[in-house]
Amino acid sequence: MFQIEIRLVMSEEVIIRKYKNTDYVQLCEVHDEARMQELIVGNAVELYAPLEEAIYKEELFSETIYVAEVNSHVVGFIAFRKNELGYIYVLKEYQGKGIGGKLLDTAIPYLKRRAFLEVFPTNIRAKVVYSSRGFVEET
């Protein structure tokens, strides 16, 4: 007889903290993987550029950024300003484990009452997280 040990990611500690310059390389990795996934879901792959080459790179780093860290590795991040949620990305293997929600919960107190964000209509997973935090869809 043998035993199988199953270790879930959520048993590992998820730390949400402010971005540091030393996170840059890992943040780029998260962005590049998750952005491609987002664009595949949104059927807009032609818009992809790695963060190093993205026209919005300067804008992203001018925002407030928090990272999600597991075992000293950045697995997600959120970037926002007072009235706009600009970017929220989590590595695929960590999605569906509440990390995006924790990042969003960190940002919400800083957002003005009427903040906005943009999401592809086909990105159902993101829309569920946003609506669970009180965001409503406007057309």
Where are the regions that the model predicts?
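Conserved beta-hairpin
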Residues: E63-G76
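Conserved active-site alpha-helix within GNAT-family acetyltransferase domains
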Residues: G101, T122-T139
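A conserved beta-strand-loop-helix scaffold within acyl/acetyltransferase catalytic domains
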Residues: I78-N83
